[in-house]
Structures are given as structure tokens and as C-alpha cells.
Amino acid sequence: MTTQSLEAEAKALNDRLEGLDLAGRLALVAGLEGRAVFTTSLGIEDQVITAALGSNRLDIEVATLKTGRLFNETVALIEATEEAYDILIKRYYPEKADIEDYVAQYGMNGFYESVEARHACCGVRKLRPLARALEGASYWITGLRRGQSGNRAATPYAEADLERGLIKINPLADWDIDVIRAHVAAEAIPVNPLHGRGYPSIGCEPCTRAIKPGEPERAGRWWWENDEKRECGLHVAEAASSIIPNASSAA
């Protein structure tokens, strides 16, 4: 598919998704021609989407990135969620050789020392496994919301991911955190207990801290960096090709 046609399809799909509720948005994507993959980090937004997929028995793959540095609470939630909704969450892991190369160059916790080292860690633990998860996919469903950070304030319902050659679907783009929490409570959706301990956004354990009152939702991610647009590379335009070598071809 050409860049122009991918962007045109994304725009048309964005318009169709806007007037639908969550179940309707996911059902629309499930009915499209082509493979759809939802990648979950087991955060509260992703649990809302997983619950909707499981409850409505929609034919959309669910995948997660087992980075090797996740909180124990996150790991435990994977199996609990599978049992709750009778679904399979496919695990994607970093390659052993990639981890060994990273540790040899930067050290096990070298990501604290520089942005370059942190990007390299995200590259081997997240971006390369993500490329395998999305291989051959036409649609990538995420839990991105406009309220998560200033960097995500303009998140559409559908957007062309030109680097990966697919359309990214953000069915919760217009949901704020209060709506998310109310929905979770009403539907008794299982969530990570860390959310109740001051962690609204949860990534790898060494790179996530609880936030302080009044801080943005994602302030606890890579908190030692000064850049206000801190991201791991999964959801930014520069991401894969600038963070890991040959990532574009891998995706």
C-alpha cells in the first residue's frame, strides 16, 4: 500500500470510528480485511480494551511484550486476565543475544546513564519484539489516550504508521482517566494493583516510579530524563528507525 493510500484509509477510518462506542470501534476493526493486533502493557486502559475484546468475542489478536524487567504485579496480571476473559495473550520476548550485546556495551542498568543507552534498551526489549508481533499486520490497536501526556494530546482514532506500513487504531483516544476508572469499577475489570499505589502509567520496574500529587500521568516514566516528551519509541514517529538499527525493515 502506498503512503497516500495508507493515509487516505486512516483518515476515512478515523471518521468512521469517531461516532462509535468502544465495542463498536473494536467490532469495526475486527470486520476489516487484514490482520489486527492489539498490544497490551496490562495498564488500566489496555485492560479496558482487553475486557471489551473478550466480552464481545472479537477476532483480534492480543499480544504483550515480556521485556524481562516488568513488575511482578504486571506479570501476574497477564494470566489473571487470560483466565478472566478466556483469551490468549501472546508473549513476545527480547532475543537473548540482543540483551547480551546491550549489557556488554552499556551494562545491565546503563539506561540511567544516557538517553542513548535508554533508547537502546527500549529498542532491544520493546521495539524489536514489537516488530515481530506486528509482522504482517494491517491494523495495530493501542491504548493511547489524549490525556496521557502533552505529547499525545492530538491522538486520533486512526492514523497511518508509515514506518511500519499499517494503520494504528486508538479506540480510547477520547476517554479521560475518570471515565476509564468509572468503567473499570462498573465492569469489575481486573487491573494492576500498582495503580492504587500511585502508578498511573506502568512500564519496566527500573524505569517507573510512583508519581507525586499534581504530576502528569506519565511523570513516573524515565523520571531521571529532562525531556518532557519522554517515550520508549513505540508510539512516536521517529521511533524505531532512530532508536535501533534496521528496525524499519524488521517491522
UniProtKB/Swiss-Prot annotation:
Positions that bind [4Fe-4S] cluster: 121-122, 204, 207
Origin superkingdom: Bacteria
Localisation: Cytoplasm
Listed GO MF terms: 4 iron, 4 sulfur cluster binding; adenylyl-sulfate reductase (thioredoxin) activity; metal ion binding; phosphoadenylyl-sulfate reductase (thioredoxin) activity
Function according to Swiss-Prot or TrEMBL: Catalyzes the formation of sulfite from adenosine 5'-phosphosulfate (APS) using thioredoxin as an electron donor.
Gene Ontology, cellular component aspect: cytoplasm
Keywords: Cytoplasm, Iron, Iron-sulfur, Metal-binding, Oxidoreductase
Pfam family, any one: PAPS_reduct
Active site: 232 (nucleophile)
Main localization (coarse): cytoplasm
GO biological-process terms attached to the record: cysteine biosynthetic process; hydrogen sulfide biosynthetic process; sulfate assimilation, phosphoadenylyl sulfate reduction by phosphoadenylyl-sulfate reductase (thioredoxin)
Cofactor binding summary note: Binds 1 [4Fe-4S] cluster per subunit.
Classification lineage: Bacteria, Pseudomonadati, Pseudomonadota, Alphaproteobacteria, Hyphomicrobiales
Required cofactor(s): [4Fe-4S] cluster
This protein's record includes keyword Coiled coil: no
Gene3D superfamilies per UniProt: HUPs
Family: Belongs to the PAPS reductase family. CysH subfamily.
EC number: 1.8.4.10
Pathway(s) per entry: Sulfur metabolism; hydrogen sulfide biosynthesis; sulfite from sulfate
Protein name per its UniProtKB record: Adenosine 5'-phosphosulfate reductase
The keyword Iron belongs to this UniProt entry's keyword annotation: yes
Signal peptide feature range: none
